[in-house]
Design a protein with these regions (language model features):
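Loop/helix-junction capping segments adjacent to catalytic residues or to phosphate/diphosphate-binding pockets
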Residues: 22-25, 49, 80-81
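Thioredoxin-like thiol-disulfide oxidoreductase module
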Residues: 44-65, 72, 92-93
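A generic local structural motif
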Residues: 1-4, 56-58
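Non-catalytic, surface beta->alpha helical segment in thiol-disulfide oxidoreductase systems
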Residues: 73-93
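Surface-exposed charge patches
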Residues: 30, 34, 57, 69
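Conserved strand-to-helix beginnings and helix N-cap segments that scaffold or border functional pockets
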Residues: 26-29, 52-53, 84
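Local sequence-structure signature of Cys/Sec-based thiol-disulfide redox active-site neighborhoods
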Residues: 2-38
Length: 93
């Protein structure tokens, strides 16, 4: 399974679980890029079945509903959905 990388200023380990067709996921990626943040993302819907199942299980540890986008910051904080203010606050600290 391949994580895609968007280079920027390192604000910790940031991982975004997304769908390639999800408007809110696209908005989250755009916000992170506008903020100049270094992050990794996985478009779960583009994965092969076996990888998709692994990633969905991994994601559900953070977000049991399995909804998108799911943003994990430093393996400590989880933000579900496009929560612009919450994302900005978490990454400015």
């Amino acid at each position: 399974m391949e994580k895609k990388h968007s280079e920027g200023v390192k604000k910790g380990e940031i991982l975004l679980y997304a769908l390639s067709t999800c408007v809110w996921c696209q908005k989250t990626k755009k916000l992170l890029k506008e903020m100049g943040v270094d992050f990794y993302y996985i478009d779960v819907d583009l994965l092969e079945d076996e990888d998709k199942k692994k990633v969905e299980e991994e994601m559900k540890r953070w977000n049991p509903r399995g909804s998108f986008p799911t943003l994990i910051i430093n393996n400590q904080k989880c933000i579900v959905g496009f929560q612009e203010d919450e994302i900005r606050k978490a990454l400015i600290e």
